[in-house]
Amino acid sequence: MCGIFGSTEKQKFITLYNLNKKRGNFAVGTLFLNQSTMVIRKFEGVVEPVRLFKNEEEVDFQMYLGHTQAPTSAKRDYSFNTSHPFEYGDWVIAHNGVLTNFGEIKNEFDSKWKNPVDSSIIPLLFSSLKNILKIMKNKM
């Protein structure tokens, strides 16, 4: 089972990462945010915390999010594109679970969606919903 964790403090984030390493040792992904910077990092397997922050040590982030991955679907090789977090438009997500209707969703929203990971389509869904709500608001 995957681990999803986050903190507003770097040291607490590192502690949470160390506690979640065993929950998913296939890959680790991170999202670091402040008002002007968003950094997404992904690594195969378990890495030392210092690698998560390489080149960002001097940046003062306000939010640290992480995901340790243990794939629940078919066996696959590590790839940046098939590891959390997933990004589309304004949305970045990490998800723990299985979308049992992934095939239907994929066909409904974008039959050319190439990513085999079910969770990867969630930010596309959010982005589509945002666009629909914007259209509805403009029609009122």
PLM features: what roles do these ranges have?
Residues 1-140:
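Conserved short alpha-helical segments that host acidic/polar catalytic motifs at enzyme active sites
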